[in-house]
Amino acid sequence: MLNPIVRKFQYGQHTVTLETGMMARQATAAVMVSMDDTAVFVTVVGQKKAKPGQDFFPLTVNYQERTYAAGRIPGSFFRREGRPSEGETLIARLIDRPIRPLFPEGFVNEVQVIATVVSVNPQVNPDIVAMIGASAALSLSGIPFNGPIGAARVGYINDQYVLNPTQDELKESKLDLVVAGTEAAVLMVESEAELLSEDQMLGAVVFGHEQQQVVIQNINELVKEAGKPRWDWQPEPVNEALNARVAALAEARLSDAYRITDKQERYAQVDVIKSETIATLLAEDETLDENELGEILHAIEKNVVRSRVLAGEPRIDGREKDMIRGLDVRTGVLPRTHGSALFTRGETQALVTATLGTARDAQVLDELMGERTDTFLFHYNFPPYSVGETGMVGSPKRREIGHGRLAKRSVLAVMPDMDKFPYTVRVVSEITESNGSSSMASVCGASLALMDAGVPIKAAVAGIAMGLVKEGDNYVVLSDILGDEDHLGDMDFKVAGSREGISALQMDIKIEGITKEIMQVALNQAKGARLHILGVMEQAINAPRGDISEFAPRIHTIKINPDKIKDVIGKGGSVIRALTEETGTTIEIEDDGTVKIAATDGEKAKHAIRRIEEITAEIEVGRVYTGKVTRIVDFGAFVAIGGGKEGLVHISQIADKRVEKVTDYLQMGQEVPVKVLEVDRQGRIRLSIKEATEQSQPAAAPEAPAAEQGE
């Protein structure tokens, strides 16, 4: 018999339901979580035994959206879901980041979390639902997990924090922040904001953490009812004697090695020390496990770096806690790109380009929440050579997608509106060197490249990565962390923004006990660092260039009568296709009659505008035009009068005397003056050569409506 156990509770304006025991009973744990018709089915499977020789924790989080959840069939050729989209990858990372630190150290059994979206309400994003589901499933499973966690989205509307805003509310919000944490501590923050202050951002984090306590309470209640017995797992006992022997051989040498400021030289020396230490110990006792020795050495490394920081000594590269590495900022480094910059901070370097395109270059995203068009693209590439390694090169990995998204969020707040700058913009960051905080180097480089491209961004933005070392009540916040400080520290805290405020905040915390005060110190220290970097960037370029690159397409805008759109497009697109080929431009027409002409050559754009104006010109009854004979028939001749308009001159209207044969008076291609006698309801035009020649006024070209033209 199926005996589902259900808990239901109010979460802000939404009702959340947790249900277990109904489906996937062979999984270690399974939960169906729903929030106002958005439902995510989350399963967890954990292996009871670790693989022999396993030296890392193999946690996999898969998040997958099924189109049936929105009542649709996939649009792909095979009509089924394929590889994860960028959005699915980002949500998988969002689930992974707060749960990973909650597994005990030394636990290396394989664990897989699969979250499947099975129903979606377009107003309720499935990401928070999936995070709650992962927390509940892990808590029910009995797998060693120091949860549960809660998750909340926080908006900021009319100077008020809003818990789990709907999609419509988010459009009005100055903030989109996701926070996750345990009952006692915040573990993860991901956000984008419209240049809010440090206090407003910190307030949002605290608000979200307070509100999500109801989620944690209800998961705990569900575990009491339906939870499986906790696994009898114990970490391997610590070999104190072996630890002491390894420390005696290596600690002093590693301490000296970590005074070498050059990364490659330091790594080489550390590798030598490790190799020699392991060789010495294996010579003494060949039964020792090499992996275990490596773990002990890593723990010593970590202790060396952390204890030095806590003692107030200089950091690995000799800096004080709040010092920024040396900066080198250059713009216009690539001659044929629309905008480019090379941003170097210590041993981290990003080559960033900005490319301008038309609306046709925008990315159309067919997402579960509905189709949308993205006119700002940000791609981050992290090749293996950036850290002096070899490796696979190809499609972006999860980390590259995540870093690109963070950098994009950082810049989004200062991008111009499409009606003021009607371009699709693509930014690409190539990480050419990396030793910590390459995503924030990408933000700085993007700001510089956009200004170099003449994109009228509202303000320059810069990003900085902060770190933390904490033992008991003693803690030190580090500015502009190195890769080693990120790896060996307790927090990775990235902040981006302008002089006015914060545009993005990302926080990953590896320990519990990070207080509001510590976050306040980190935010304030980050502000000082951000302003310092902006000052250096402004010396290279302090405002967007006055004009876009000569190699970028220039977009000219004119307005036509919406009723005339069909005339410009033509049957089956024939007219607009011919216009594009004739003028060498790209032409886009919107439903309100806005026409955008993109061309790298100003003369080509003017030619296209002139032709469109001719096509859309109103024919005035009683006016005389100069036309060209296009067709001769027994009863008269057809004459083109410009703009694709053609009218009939009846045989009786050719001359002021009887005409027996049309060809006696008119030849194909002949230019003749014609007067418009009538335009009937079907748009057919009656013309007269006879009346035109009788009039004394000179012939006129079709008159076009006044056009708005802008760049």
Swiss-Prot record:
Highest taxon above the source species: Bacteria
Keywords, sorted A to Z: Cytoplasm, Magnesium, Metal-binding, Nucleotidyltransferase, RNA-binding, Transferase
Residues at which Mg(2+) binds: D486, D492
Region called Disordered, residue ranges: 689-711
The protein's required cofactors: Mg(2+)
Reaction catalyzed: RNA(n+1) + phosphate = RNA(n) + a ribonucleoside 5'-diphosphate
Record carries keyword Magnesium: yes
Residue ranges of every copy of the KH domain listed in the record: 553-612
CDD domains: KH-I_PNPase (cd02393), RNase_PH_PNPase_1 (cd11363), RNase_PH_PNPase_2 (cd11364), S1_PNPase (cd04472)
GO biological process, one term: RNA processing
A molecular function (GO) term: magnesium ion binding
Quaternary organization: Component of the RNA degradosome, which is a multiprotein complex involved in RNA processing and mRNA degradation.
Family the UniProt entry places it in: Belongs to the polyribonucleotide nucleotidyltransferase family.
Entry protein name: Polyribonucleotide nucleotidyltransferase
